């Protein structure tokens, strides 16, 4: 549940823990996995084009889209004010929650399950997803 708990909820419901630290870890894990899948899936691509594509995929907008696709928005625990302010639709909230979920997946199962999820998310966008 921590991965889906926004800081506003944790503030209103102590001792609930929020997802910010998990999002920090998830950002790093996601960057590694996306970079690896891009390098393996596009042999001969230069670092410039790989960097641009990775940045597009892991942008706040891109992550929010993936979060919606996975239904993360429906599972978020938000404080009253954040919920009333449209927190479930905020790209930054969704992106952070997805990063936190991926970090929790990594902590529980290592890189393999994260690679599996990210590969599935990348494929509909026409990305090469090897590994």
Annotate each PLM feature.
Residues 1-131:
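Double-stranded RNA-binding/processing signature
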